[in-house]
Amino acid sequence: MPVLDILVEGMGHINFAQEMIDRKGITDRVTLSGMTLMNWDVFLLPLPDAWVSALPAGKADQTRPGTFFRGTFKVEKPADTFIDMTGYRKGVVWVNGHNLGRYWDIGPQTRLYCPASWLKAGENRVIVFDLHQAQALSLKAVGAPDQ
C-alpha cells in the first residue's frame, strides 16, 4: 500500500479584518496518483526541548529534507553569542537543550542570540532541525547580531 507523509508547518494566522478566516495546513482533499486518500492520521510534532535533546544520533538521509542535525562546539569562557545560520534554509535551533528559536533564509535576520547562561565551558551541543536542508553545514558563532 502506498504511503504519503506530509509535514505542514503552521506559520501563524492573520487575526484581523476580512482575513480572519486565514486557513492553514491541509485545506482540501489529499490525493495520491489521482485517488483521494481516506482514513489518514494527523498528529502533532510539538518538539519539546527534552525530546529533541534525547534524539539518538544517526546518519541523515541526504536525499530527503526535514532533517535533524547534531553537532558539538567548544567554548573556553561562556559569553553572549550569536549563531549564524547562513546556508541553512528554514528551521529551529537548540543549544544544550534550549530552544534558540526559528530561522528562515529570507531574512532579515540570519543570526540567533544565545545567552552566555545557556553555554558551558568545554563541549556544548547544538541541534538543528531544517525543513528543507538535506545535508549538514558548519555553523559559526559570532559576537554580534546581523548588521
Named regions from a protein language model:
Residues 44-69:
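Edge strands and adjacent loops of beta-rich recognition modules
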Residues 62, 66, 89-90, 99:
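C-terminal effector modules of nucleic-acid-centric enzymes and ribosome-associated factors
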Residues 1, 14, 80, 99-123:
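A cross-kingdom feature marking solvent-exposed beta-strand/loop segments within repeated
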Residues 63-76, 110-112:
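Short beta-strands within extracellular/lumenal beta-sheet-rich domains
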Residues 14-15, 81, 92-93, 100-101, ...:
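Short loop/beta submotifs within extracellular cysteine-rich repeat domains
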Residues 109-147:
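Terminal leader/tail segments of proteins
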Residues 9-38, 133-147:
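Glycine/proline-rich low-complexity spacer/linker segments in large multi-domain proteins
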Residues 4, 73-96, 103-104, 126-129:
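Aromatic-lined ligand-binding clefts that engage carbohydrates, nucleic acids, or primary amines
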